[in-house]
Amino acid sequence: MQDVVQAYYGKELQSTADLKTSACCDADAVPDWLKPLLARVHPEVSSRYYGCGLVCPPLLEGCRVLDLGSGSGRDVYLLSQLVGASGEVVGVDMTPEQLAVAREYLPFHAEQFGYANVRFLEGQIERLEELDLEPGSFDVIVSNCVLNLSTDKPAVLRGIQRLLKPGGEFYFSDVYVDRRLPEAVQSHPVLYGECLGGALYWNDFLRMARGAAFTDPRLVSDRPLEITEPQLAALVGEARFYSATYRLFNIPELEDACEDH
């Protein structure tokens, strides 16, 4: 399915107008404090944004942040402003066409912000150990509607846990579903590219997160998704999809429930 994803995001989609569902459209209201920062991101970068939520947690100044599946770089350039000149943001993506857009506007954003604190790496999020990324070196790792596109989600979570500093967090938005999906939906190229075919069944995700030592997943927000194209809606049947934002903390000694000893 990686070839399908690369082709869909590298060649099929040229802007958000080409999307066929609301899964990869950010319907979350942009908070007022973030609007001026978003306005400083180049329009060409923003037009190729396919996220499903906001992955800009507060209090990032001076932090080292990694964005998995960074695409055209919109979130990277937002985060660049939040971490400031003393921080760093690294984007990882496997799609050359998306990376080309992100890298083309590196000089533009460095001039806009008054500093250069961003770099982009080409690679697969399931194989982060192959990239020039030091274990235990990131304060925060983010991703936006990306984990569902992976064919080996446990490997992604293990790689994230390996790269986070003790006490660091994985702050991410993704697509979830209220049941396990049949093979016909999982393997459908458009549904997969639209972030639905690989959507995480809620309970499978929670088990997966705990298996990667993220013992207490915290839900930040969620919203239902709409499938307006009749043929696609018929394929998914009664399944209900949601965009949700979670926080996973790298605290190995953390218990899996709130306790009062």
Where are these regions (language model features)?
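Conserved alpha-helix/loop element of class I SAM-dependent methyltransferases that forms part
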Residues: 28-64, 78, 82
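Short alpha-helix
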Residues: 198-213, 219
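C-terminal lobe and adjacent flexible extensions of AdoMet/dcAdoMet transferase-like proteins
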Residues: 212, 218-224, 229-261
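A short SAM/SAH-binding and catalytic strip from SAM-dependent methyltransferases
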Residues: 139-152
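Short, glycine-/aromatic-enriched active-site segment of Class I SAM-dependent methyltransferases
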Residues: 176-196
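Class I SAM-dependent methyltransferase SAM/SAH-binding core
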Residues: 60, 64-68, 76-128
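A short acidic, Gly/Pro-enriched loop at the edge of an enzyme's catalytic core
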Residues: 129-140
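A short glycine-rich, Lys/Arg-flanked "PGG" loop and its adjoining helix->strand segment in the class I
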Residues: 154-169
